[in-house]
Amino acid sequence: MAGQKIRIRLKAYDHEVIDSSARKIVETVTRTGARVAGPVPLPTEKNVYCVIRSPHKDKDSREHFEMRTHKRLIDIIDPTPRTVDSLMRLDLPAGVDIEIKL
């Protein structure tokens, strides 16, 4: 698999969970002999929802809720077959979304 690159993109609502997952991935990849670039923190996506507090009156009283999506990017340069196998076996928390591009 010489000359190839694997790009892993992680998304999660909790920054501690995504950082620990990125640490696990980097640790696993370096143990198998491939080079790693990252984790690179990408901009946090912030969605704000505005809701009227009362069900039928008082439009001036509103409540704001926000949802933050944290993202990280990890590049694996020159992966070995052992690297790919160990990444497939890696256990990560349920709150982390993973996209892998070859």
Swiss-Prot record:
Pfam families cross-referenced by the UniProt entry: Ribosomal_S10 (PF00338)
Cysteines joined through disulfide linkages: none
Molecular-function annotations in GO: structural constituent of ribosome; tRNA binding
GO biological process: translation
GO cellular component, one term: ribonucleoprotein complex
Key words, A-Z: Ribonucleoprotein, Ribosomal protein
Assembly and oligomerization: Part of the 30S ribosomal subunit.
Family per record: Belongs to the universal ribosomal protein uS10 family.
Known function: Involved in the binding of tRNA to the ribosomes.
Protein name per the record: Small ribosomal subunit protein uS10
The encoding gene: rpsJ
